[in-house]
Amino acid sequence: MKYDDLLNIPYKPHGRTKEEGFDCYGIAVEMCKRAGTPLKDIYDISTLPTSLVNDYINGGVNIRKIDRPKIGGLAEFTRHGRLHVGYIVERGKVIHATTDKGVIITPIEIMKPIAFYEVINESDAIHDTIKK
C-alpha cells in the first residue's frame, strides 16, 4: 500500500488530512481508508481519564484486540504519558504522527506496544457486541 506521500506531513492536533496535517489517530484513519477497512473516527480522547480510554475505544470503535501485531492492524502505545496509536505498515514497522517530527515510520519494538488491534467491519463489530 502506498504511504510515502504521507511521510513528513506535520503534526496537527485533531488533523485528518494531508493539507492540514495529522495527529496519530488521524494517520490511522487515513491508512485504514487506503486499505479499504475504514476506521471510525473518534473525538479527542485526551480529555478522557486514562481509566476510561480503553473502554471508550473498545466500545466505540470498530476494532478487536489481537495477541500480536498484524500488517494492516493498529498498535497502541503510551508516548510521553499519553495514549498513542500507529498503523502497522509492514512487519515490525508502524506509521504514526509525532508532535516533533510529523508522520514517520518507526520500528514497533522501539515504541514498546501495550496492545494490538485489527480493524473489523460493522457486522463483525455488532456480532462481537452481541456475544458479550
Sequence positions of predicted segments:
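A glycine-biased structural micro-motif
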Residues: 4-16
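Onset of an N-terminal alpha helix
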Residues: 3-4, 21
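Short intrinsically disordered terminal tails
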Residues: 1, 131-132
